[in-house]
């Protein structure tokens, strides 16, 4: 069942785009954090992903020595792999705590990738986690949640909360994402101004 003449009727049609969702509520984020707390590497990857808005490919290139001695409020300058533009990885308080929780959990050399896999290269060195591996991890973390989630969900979650919770303008988020226009950022996040206005009806 599910296939007819060698095709899967549930598979997206050729040329169609699959929308990847941000994690839109804080309860789900807290639930994932609780689930990952016993897995320091994965916990750090999640916290770092939702707090910086960087592409996962750039996070996976970070090495232990790049961030070991950074304090909260300090930054690491990176060159984006896709755009070749200079950007920064900010170490906020949540990231700093997750980072040191991870670094204290095992012996890691400065030349090790921060998010290393079990796979090794020809010289016997650990490779970084593959993007496809992280995508599977994200799908596991978000299992049972409505929506479609992958590595981009971490990056999108950062932008979603910056706009909806903190009221940061699309122009500022656009610059962080290195998008060519705020309109692209709005479509990327799937946010309309009405969605922002609706939350103002919430009573505290």
Residue ranges and their predicted role:
Residues 1-204:
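Conserved catalytic core of the tyrosine transesterase superfamily
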